[in-house]
Amino acid sequence: MAKFDHFNLLGPFYDWIFSLRNSSKLVKMVDLFPQQALLDIGGGTGRVSENFSGISSSIFVADPAIKMLREAHKKGLMVIIANSEALPFRPASFERVIMIDAFHHVAQHQLTLDEIWRVLKPGGRLVIEEPNIRNIFGKLIAIGEKILLMRSKIIAPEEIISMCAFQDVENIRFVIKSALVWVMIDKRA
Protein backbone atom coordinates (compact mmCIF):
# COMPACT_ATOMS: atom_id res chain seq x y z
CA MET A 1 0.00 0.00 0.00
CA ALA A 2 1.34 3.43 -0.94
CA LYS A 3 2.15 5.74 1.94
CA PHE A 4 0.89 9.31 2.10
CA ASP A 5 3.65 11.95 2.06
CA HIS A 6 2.80 13.52 5.43
CA PHE A 7 6.01 15.47 5.90
CA ASN A 8 6.03 17.31 2.58
CA LEU A 9 2.40 18.23 3.18
CA LEU A 10 3.16 19.51 6.70
CA GLY A 11 6.41 21.28 5.79
CA PRO A 12 5.16 24.88 5.75
CA PHE A 13 3.08 24.39 8.92
CA TYR A 14 5.14 21.90 10.94
CA ASP A 15 6.78 24.37 13.33
CA TRP A 16 3.44 25.99 14.02
CA ILE A 17 1.83 22.63 14.86
CA PHE A 18 4.72 21.01 16.74
CA SER A 19 6.75 22.99 19.23
CA LEU A 20 10.11 21.87 20.58
CA ARG A 21 10.10 20.61 24.13
CA ASN A 22 13.11 20.34 26.42
CA SER A 23 15.45 22.30 24.14
CA SER A 24 17.78 23.34 26.99
CA LYS A 25 18.04 19.73 28.18
CA LEU A 26 18.80 18.58 24.63
CA VAL A 27 21.44 21.28 24.09
CA LYS A 28 23.13 20.14 27.31
CA MET A 29 23.01 16.45 26.27
CA VAL A 30 24.48 17.15 22.84
CA ASP A 31 27.29 19.28 24.34
CA LEU A 32 28.23 20.95 21.04
CA PHE A 33 31.30 23.21 20.91
CA PRO A 34 31.81 26.12 18.45
CA GLN A 35 34.33 24.34 16.21
CA GLN A 36 32.26 21.15 15.96
CA ALA A 37 29.97 20.06 13.13
CA LEU A 38 26.42 18.88 13.86
CA LEU A 39 24.24 16.68 11.65
CA ASP A 40 20.49 16.65 12.35
CA ILE A 41 19.11 13.54 10.63
CA GLY A 42 15.40 13.71 9.90
CA GLY A 43 15.65 17.32 11.03
CA GLY A 44 12.93 18.55 8.68
CA THR A 45 12.24 22.23 9.29
CA GLY A 46 15.29 22.70 11.48
CA ARG A 47 13.17 23.37 14.56
CA VAL A 48 15.75 21.50 16.65
CA SER A 49 18.91 22.54 14.79
CA GLU A 50 18.16 26.24 15.13
CA ASN A 51 18.76 25.85 18.89
CA PHE A 52 22.41 25.16 18.06
CA SER A 53 22.92 27.90 15.46
CA GLY A 54 24.35 30.28 18.06
CA ILE A 55 26.90 27.67 19.11
CA SER A 56 28.28 26.40 15.79
CA SER A 57 28.11 27.60 12.20
CA SER A 58 28.55 24.07 10.84
CA ILE A 59 25.05 22.64 11.18
CA PHE A 60 23.50 20.38 8.55
CA VAL A 61 19.88 19.22 8.36
CA ALA A 62 19.39 16.00 6.37
CA ASP A 63 15.86 14.95 5.46
CA PRO A 64 14.10 13.37 2.46
CA ALA A 65 11.17 15.85 2.63
CA ILE A 66 11.98 18.80 0.38
CA LYS A 67 9.20 21.03 1.71
CA MET A 68 10.41 20.50 5.27
CA LEU A 69 13.97 21.39 4.24
CA ARG A 70 12.76 24.61 2.59
CA GLU A 71 11.69 25.79 6.04
CA ALA A 72 15.10 24.88 7.49
CA HIS A 73 16.82 26.77 4.67
CA LYS A 74 14.77 29.88 5.51
CA LYS A 75 16.32 29.70 8.99
CA GLY A 76 19.81 29.88 7.49
CA LEU A 77 20.63 26.22 8.09
CA MET A 78 22.56 24.09 5.60
CA VAL A 79 20.22 21.47 4.17
CA ILE A 80 20.67 18.28 2.22
CA ILE A 81 18.05 15.97 0.74
CA ALA A 82 18.98 12.55 2.07
CA ASN A 83 17.65 9.35 3.55
CA SER A 84 19.18 8.18 6.81
CA GLU A 85 20.08 4.82 5.27
CA ALA A 86 22.43 6.41 2.69
CA LEU A 87 24.00 9.60 4.04
CA PRO A 88 25.97 11.54 1.39
CA PHE A 89 28.89 12.41 3.68
CA ARG A 90 32.43 11.13 4.03
CA PRO A 91 33.28 8.92 6.98
CA ALA A 92 33.99 10.78 10.24
CA SER A 93 32.43 14.09 9.09
CA PHE A 94 30.57 15.15 12.27
CA GLU A 95 31.39 15.50 15.95
CA ARG A 96 27.72 15.42 16.87
CA VAL A 97 24.74 13.68 15.27
CA ILE A 98 21.18 14.09 16.49
CA MET A 99 18.00 12.34 15.47
CA ILE A 100 15.02 13.87 17.24
CA ASP A 101 11.59 12.26 16.92
CA ALA A 102 12.66 10.69 13.63
CA PHE A 103 14.21 7.25 14.26
CA HIS A 104 10.82 5.55 14.35
CA HIS A 105 10.08 6.89 10.84
CA VAL A 106 13.03 5.25 9.05
CA ALA A 107 12.60 2.10 6.97
CA GLN A 108 15.78 0.34 8.08
CA HIS A 109 16.81 1.05 11.66
CA GLN A 110 20.05 -0.94 11.69
CA LEU A 111 21.24 0.52 8.39
CA THR A 112 20.46 4.00 9.72
CA LEU A 113 22.56 3.39 12.84
CA ASP A 114 25.39 1.95 10.72
CA GLU A 115 25.36 5.09 8.54
CA ILE A 116 25.29 7.39 11.56
CA TRP A 117 28.24 5.57 13.06
CA ARG A 118 30.12 5.84 9.77
CA VAL A 119 29.76 9.65 9.58
CA LEU A 120 30.36 10.22 13.32
CA LYS A 121 33.93 11.22 14.16
CA PRO A 122 35.94 9.39 16.81
CA GLY A 123 35.18 11.13 20.10
CA GLY A 124 31.77 12.12 18.72
CA ARG A 125 28.32 11.76 20.23
CA LEU A 126 24.98 10.53 18.90
CA VAL A 127 21.76 11.63 20.62
CA ILE A 128 18.45 10.02 19.64
CA GLU A 129 15.15 11.28 21.08
CA GLU A 130 12.09 9.09 20.64
CA PRO A 131 8.64 8.60 22.12
CA ASN A 132 8.67 6.20 25.07
CA ILE A 133 6.76 3.16 23.78
CA ARG A 134 6.27 1.95 27.36
CA ASN A 135 4.36 5.12 28.25
CA ILE A 136 0.68 5.62 27.38
CA PHE A 137 1.55 8.72 25.31
CA GLY A 138 4.15 6.78 23.34
CA LYS A 139 1.61 4.05 22.68
CA LEU A 140 -0.96 6.63 21.57
CA ILE A 141 1.61 8.14 19.18
CA ALA A 142 2.28 4.68 17.72
CA ILE A 143 -1.44 4.02 17.26
CA GLY A 144 -2.07 7.47 15.79
CA GLU A 145 0.76 7.16 13.28
CA LYS A 146 -0.47 3.70 12.26
CA ILE A 147 -3.98 5.12 11.66
CA LEU A 148 -2.43 7.90 9.56
CA LEU A 149 -0.59 5.25 7.49
CA MET A 150 2.81 6.55 8.52
CA ARG A 151 5.80 4.24 8.22
CA SER A 152 6.55 4.20 11.94
CA LYS A 153 7.96 1.68 14.38
CA ILE A 154 8.74 3.01 17.84
CA ILE A 155 11.53 0.97 19.41
CA ALA A 156 12.35 0.60 23.11
CA PRO A 157 15.65 2.20 24.18
CA GLU A 158 17.18 -1.16 25.14
CA GLU A 159 16.60 -2.40 21.59
CA ILE A 160 18.19 0.73 20.10
CA ILE A 161 21.18 0.18 22.37
CA SER A 162 21.45 -3.48 21.34
CA MET A 163 21.62 -2.34 17.69
CA CYS A 164 24.65 -0.19 18.58
CA ALA A 165 27.08 -3.03 19.23
CA PHE A 166 29.90 -1.19 17.45
CA GLN A 167 33.51 -2.01 18.38
CA ASP A 168 34.36 1.59 19.24
CA VAL A 169 31.51 2.54 21.60
CA GLU A 170 32.93 4.33 24.61
CA ASN A 171 29.77 5.11 26.54
CA ILE A 172 26.11 4.32 26.00
CA ARG A 173 23.15 5.31 28.13
CA PHE A 174 19.52 6.28 28.01
CA VAL A 175 17.28 8.63 29.97
CA ILE A 176 13.53 8.17 30.25
CA LYS A 177 11.29 11.07 31.18
CA SER A 178 7.65 9.98 30.98
CA ALA A 179 6.69 10.25 27.29
CA LEU A 180 10.25 10.66 25.92
CA VAL A 181 13.43 8.62 25.74
CA TRP A 182 16.93 9.91 24.97
CA VAL A 183 19.64 7.48 23.88
CA MET A 184 23.19 8.88 24.00
CA ILE A 185 26.13 7.03 22.50
CA ASP A 186 29.73 8.28 22.59
CA LYS A 187 32.25 7.01 20.06
CA ARG A 188 35.73 6.23 21.36
CA ALA A 189 38.34 8.83 20.38
What are these regions (language model features)?
Residues 1-33, 47-48, 141-142:
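Conserved class I S-adenosyl-L-methionine
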Residues 39-86:
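Class I SAM-dependent methyltransferase SAM/SAH-binding core
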Residues 184-189:
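C-terminal lobe and adjacent flexible extensions of AdoMet/dcAdoMet transferase-like proteins
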